[in-house]
Amino acid sequence: MSAANTERLKDEGSKLQVVVAGATAGMIARFVIAPLDVVKIRLQLQTHSLSDPLSQRAELLRGGPVYKGTLSTMRHIARQEGITGLWKGNVPAELLYITYSAVQFATYRSAAQLLHRVAGEDRQLPAAAESFVAGAAAGVTSTTVTYPLDLLRTRFAAQGSGDDRVYQSLRRAVADIWRDEGYRGFFRGIGPAVGQTFPFMGIFFAAYESLRAPLADLKLPFWGGQLALASMTASTLAKTAVFPLDLVRRRIQVQGPTRSKYVHKNIPEYKGTFSTISTIARTEGFRGLYRGLTVSLIKSAPASAVTMWTYERVLRALITFQSGRQD
């Protein structure tokens, strides 16, 4: 078992190295999973009943699409909006992923080290508990800092093409939201976002740190496969646990004066987290709270694997480079 695999994340690299590695990991991960992200958002914004054909027919009559699954949704978007439609919102999304990952890893490292110092050598928290708290703090901090970019990413992914576009550019979108909705418009849905991020990141980092060392000696056919497997497993567990709140966040993000102008024309008006959950459960059934879960897991697992694999490799390269310069 290598030292790199037995060390915990909080003990590796300087703050600058962590920020650079995190930003690089976020940038690469976003580009890889962009089409799946657009598909997930489109599926999450559908509001027709999954079991009622009449509801689906009504959606078609209103001019909105009815998406059935990951691959068919991807084909539909590519056919109707061009292949670039699968990368809608990529500019704010890239900025989001780069900033989010940099803040996330830096905060995780700082929070874990702070917990270690506060507890003292004699009263250390269990490693899993320390990882949960530090991961949750990292998730809440990075979500809050980057939330306006997340909202912009969702709105761009939800809009149509050509004359059906709600926003013509990122600059125009920022100006329109500021004019029509004020600064609060950039933070629509932040309640469920933070509500799902706290347990998600806590579960993810606790599971990842717990699996990282045991899987280190596992023989896999590709370099770094143990890290990828640990992150994919952790991501699947965490995402499934908090998915309804992720869906609620998306629904609330497209509220406001542009609500009826996106690809899905019939998005209801939602007021708050709990009333949104209640409305979705009543009108779409319990399954409605898990729309897009499959593609979310398909997206989340490789995204987490790419992020953690890239982060650890870039960080290791930066540490090696720094050591070489000092020698």
Swiss-Prot record:
It is a multi-pass membrane protein. It holds the Pfam family Mito_carr. GO terms for cellular component: mitochondrial inner membrane. GO terms for biological process: transmembrane transport. SUPFAM superfamilies: Mitochondrial carrier. It comes from the Eukaryota. Solcar repeats lie at residues 13-114, 126-214, 222-317. It is found in: Mitochondrion inner membrane. Keywords: Membrane, Mitochondrion, Mitochondrion inner membrane, Repeat, Transmembrane, Transmembrane helix, Transport. The chain crosses the membrane at residues 16-36, 95-111, 132-152, 189-209, 223-245, 292-309. InterPro entries: Mit_carrier, Mitochondrial_sb/sol_carrier, Mt_carrier_dom_sf. Belongs to the mitochondrial carrier (TC 2.A.29) family. Mitochondrial transporter that mediates uptake of thiamine pyrophosphate (ThPP) into mitochondria. This is Mitochondrial thiamine pyrophosphate carrier 1.
